[in-house]
Amino acid sequence: MTRTIMLVPIGKNIGLTTISLSVISAMKRCKFNVKFLKSAIEYSNTNYNIDDTSLILKDTQSLSYINPLIVDFINQFSLKQIKQRIVDYILSKVYAKKEKYDIFLIEGFDTKSHTYVLSNDINYYISKSINVEIVFVCAVDRSSQLDINNIVYIINNVFKKNKNINIRGVIINELCQKVRNDYGNVNLFDMFKSSVKKINFGDVKYDFLFQKNGIEVLGCVPWIHKLMEPSVKILCDKYLGANIIYDRCMNSQYIKTFIIYDTNEDIKNAKKFHRSLLIIPAISNDKIKEICVQINKNKILISAILLTNFLNVHDKCTDFIDQLKIANCTICSTPNDVFTVVSLLHKFNFKLDNKNYQLNIIENDMSRHINLDWIRSLKHSYQYNSICLPSLFIYNLKHLAKKFMKNILLPEGCELRIIKAASICSKNDIAYCTLLGNPKKIKNIAESNNIVLNSNIEIIDPKLIRKNYVERLCHLRRHHGITLAHANELVKDNSILSTLILESKKVDGLVSGSIGTTSSIILPALQLIKTSPGSSLISSVFFMLLSDYVTLYADCAVNINPDATQLAEIAIQSSNTARLFGIFPKVAMLSYATGCSGFGDTVDKVKEATRIVQERSPNLIVDGPIQYDAAINRSVAKLKCPHSLVAGNATVFIFPDLNSGNITYKAVQRSANILSIGPILQGINQPVNDLSRGSSVQDIVYTIAVTVLQSSLSH
């Protein structure tokens, strides 16, 4: 079983690339076959359409990866559309190739130009839309409970609020960032009376602070200063915005450490100052010149000198500037004081490149701070949430339809929405579509609306084939005294003609109803195709794609007032449909009362129907009578029926009659602005599906896909 892990950053500049590479290294050490995907990156004129982690993997050829999706927050789409595009992209890349790898590692979105709240929003949407195991990545630079509490607050209030999200734990990065003071390696934050200590994996304090909130610490990666060595150009010029007084190979000089100059000491120890950025507070010009002389005299290789509180370099004489060059390093200045500079350095995003020695540090040192017990546990199967997620449901619907590619008949061939849907299905290989109607009229409608009708869309003129089905109709209805003349009249109805075409098995399924009535679809199906073995009735079900999961509503379109036996059959049919589409059925037999709290004919009918379901399908999880709020909401369920296996977790909702079912499905669909697919017909020998007259093109496409799957999977 392929495990799908997503690293979700909490905050900005947390060293996500470092952690991703460390986790990859730990996984490879445990002999896992890993595939990497960065979810998305922001469009930029300066980037190369690839993220930092993928770029390193590309340059080192160390791991298979997939290029990220490029998103443009300024010029393209709404945020909602962007989030859905990212989810669709991940699904198309990950789920199509999952079986080839042991682990799919997804790196969450981290914004460079917006607040990290945007990253949280996008990563939350991804997390709740696809079945992944979430590992949070955060940086705790100052060992304070306040800092950790803020991270825990975000996890609890942004991510944990959704019951679908699989949270595995957290990896903490950059625990011990150091800025070295002269002589003694004093931690910078000690200067400001902050107690930062080095914390190794499994530190009791970190374990306690996270685990008391139900979050397991999967790694504590200490700061390793030699890993991140920015160039003088990157750090001083681009990041700090310092004024460059003297440039000596800024691009090729790298900063190994930072040193705040101590006026009470001389610069003699070459080892301590080697490749450092020497930060000099406000002192006299003579003292600055003296420092440069000492650097030259003691042959110390300093990367750069940064003069703080340096207001205007142009006020200094040229001779003074020339005298500084004796230090043989880049000289720069800033009007900021030492404290401001240090604060900026603290926030600097040290960016990895593909230097071999940096990658060796990650592989040989940093990756060992990832909990290998967790990594090894990934070889075992993992029970993801059984809830069917909307985005995953749609992906599987289209993916499986492409796999089977059945021929679906659309008798309302001259309807614009039908023509558009057929074109989309053809373009995306969802189905072969056959349009019934006047070919010239259909082609004119398509042309005037810029719709492409591919060669695999067949158009049949019903006038040319009606006579072919007269005898068959007479045979099928022979016990009802049908005459040849009457049959000739009946086949002029496209609903009857299309049902006869399906019955002859020249097509695999039938979708109609965008301009017709439900009865005009169901009656010919009942008369000519008949109910499936073991079924005494045809019922309907709607797939309701709520914000966080998919449920089934039945019967909302066919049976007006079913009795207890019929209601039980509808429940069993609906549970079978749920299984067919990968949804684990937990059936709620709905009523206005829960358990024994109410009385009346409807309650009694639902009680009896529940008993019949339990008798006929003893392995089916079913409960009733139960109210809608108790069936769908866990909090209400705990109060009204705490011992129910269905309450709060129902996936199949059976309404007592058509009145309540039809009203509820339309109220939920319109009020919550959700997608519903249906009515999907059940209990029939061959797939026939009805469309609501208000169906959108998208609704029709999905109904066609469902019909393809019914035709394929039911056998």
UniProtKB/Swiss-Prot annotation:
Q: Which InterPro entries match?
A: P-Actrans_bac (IPR016475), P-loop_NTPase (IPR027417), P_AcTrfase (IPR004614), P_AcTrfase_dom1 (IPR042113), P_AcTrfase_dom2 (IPR042112), Phos_Acetyltrans/Butyryltrans (IPR050500), PTA_PTB (IPR002505), Ser_kin/Pase_Hpr-like_N_sf (IPR028979)
Asked if the Swiss-Prot or TrEMBL record annotates the protein with the keyword Glycoprotein, the reply is no
**Signal peptide bounds:** none
For the keyword Heme, the answer is no
Entry EC no(s): 2.3.1.8
Q: What is its main location?
A: cytoplasm
List localization entries. Answer: Cytoplasm
**Which residues lie within the region annotated Phosphate acetyltransferase?**
392-715
**Which BP terms in the Gene Ontology apply to this protein?**
acetyl-CoA biosynthetic process
Among the GO molecular function terms of this UniProt record, one is: phosphate acetyltransferase activity
Q: Pathway, per UniProt?
A: Metabolic intermediate biosynthesis; acetyl-CoA biosynthesis; acetyl-CoA from acetate: step 2/2
Q: Which GO terms describe its cellular component?
A: cytoplasm
Q: What class of enzyme is it?
A: transferase
Q: What does this protein do?
A: Involved in acetate metabolism.
Self-association state and partner proteins as the record states = Homohexamer.
Domain text: The N-terminal region seems to be important for proper quaternary structure. The C-terminal region contains the substrate-binding site.
What protein family is recorded? In the N-terminal section; belongs to the CobB/CobQ family.
Q: What is this protein called?
A: Phosphate acetyltransferase
Organism from which the protein derives? Buchnera aphidicola subsp. Baizongia pistaciae (strain Bp)
